[in-house]
């Protein structure tokens, strides 16, 4: 279903009429803002109307699952995109946050039946996060 000359291997998708939430983690917000901008560009390419996009922010990646589950339970959205960045430090904190964010996001979609996308970068350095969050 790829058009001739298209660089995308995705089938033709149309998000018209879908209500999509983007939940971003404020920690490392300069990187998460790049991810948000990319998500908005992608939704625009899929014909999701600006008025059908709900944006919300939480303190960090650890809080994404609770916000996603609460929002999914309202029935006001068809899908949720969770965005965050966790950069490895010198303590095990990185592992705890990454593991619980991933598990919690998965649990939120399984509990509610609403798709919840895991858009959390888990990287070793800020430069890796910047490289992975820019336009592409």
Annotate each PLM feature:
Residues 94-95, 99-136:
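C-terminal binding/interaction regions
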